Amino acid sequence: MASSEIEVVSSDSKAQQNPSEAPVIDVFSACAYGDFQKLRKFVEEDGASLSQPDLNGYYAIQWAALNNFPDIVQYIIEHGGDVNATDNMQQTALHWVAVRGAIAVADVLLQNGARVEAVDVNGYRAVHVAAQYGQTAFLNHIVVKYQADFDAPDNEGRSPIHWAAYKGFADTIRLLLFRDACQGRQDKEGCTPLHWAAIRGHVEACTVLVHAGTKQELMVKDNAGFTPAQLASDKGHRHVALFLSNAQRAHSNHWLGKFWSGKMADIGYAPILFCTIIILTVLFINSILAAPNLPKVTAVVGLWGWAAVSVSVGSLVMFYRCSKDPGYLKRPGDVGYHKDTEDLLLNIDLNNSSMWTGNWSQLCPTCKIVRPVRSKHCPICKRCVEQFDHHCPWISNCVGKVRSCINYYFCPSQKRKMKPFDGFIKFCFLIKWVDVWDKDIASEIFIIS
């Protein structure tokens, strides 16, 4: 799989830190190293042209754009530089900007007439180059502000999500899936993005694609007849092959495999726990408290016995409460969801927002929402949960912001873990009961323990 060939001048080189020591001999080197003073001298005093390429066919505006010098780019445009000038590979300055993700330079170029959909000899657009180099913020910027086509194919039929999967940039994949990029598209080799992620052994990229995808992406074969799992196994990526094989098994058409890997995995142990509580309660009442063949229980024994029954009934009440909403985040289309604009990311100031921490994993490509901090997507419930801890099989529900305190009574490991707080928690339950339980205090206890 070929990659875009763009020469990069190191931004942390000694020459760039001290332009006076750089070998600045013409307008091209002046633009590459950001020596604005010498550039003006070459142009205004020596009469050098900014519209002609160097010996390799590269333009001054490309070098300035690559190394993120927006003031020099603006100067070049004002002095005859062509924003759409192309080199021997038909790449424009915008292609070079995408390598470094220089948003400020991209704005200068695009506001001065640069074509956002310009293609090179390989059919790469700026969105393809940004995906190849993992420039997620840059990609989102040109899509939101300049309506760049994030799903356009190159000459080999590969869209930006193919390149992001091949290079293993999971955040870029999340953004593209969040914007409804087609993850089932096959290129000329018959490969989907999942095929390329499996070939390179990128576990996180495969995980994002599988959780946001369907059975079809797991089972589709390339032109050689291989599925993503088979390609991962053939390349020696055992962890990826195992993950994809398990995902295939969960979607198996065989009724037994589908039952155990699919339905039972979703249902969990909740029916077993529910039936156990009911059966033990009935047996206790019939065999001990109301047994006709046993001596009549004393008042003290009866008090403790019915207290045990009350605890059992209370457990059923809490079991019912655990089956409720654990703190699901509202999705587009849900009742109570407010969407002020067509683009969800337009509502967020990426530089100054209590909700945004600069982590693109906050985007959920499945639920199409921007998650708050500490929220995660549950692949079993297929919902995003606020303050997600884990999916508990004993209650067949997630443990999140709302249910973290109640889950304590159904998880033996958590009960041992929180032994020092046992008396305090029981006291709080006796005083406030479940409906008025202070969730914030319980959550803090859960975290501290």
Can you annotate each of these PLM segments?
Residues 245, 249-375, 382-391, 395-449:
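Membrane-associated feature with strongest affinity for ZDHHC
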Residues 49-50, 83, 116, 150, ...:
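Ankyrin-repeat inter-repeat connecting loop/turn
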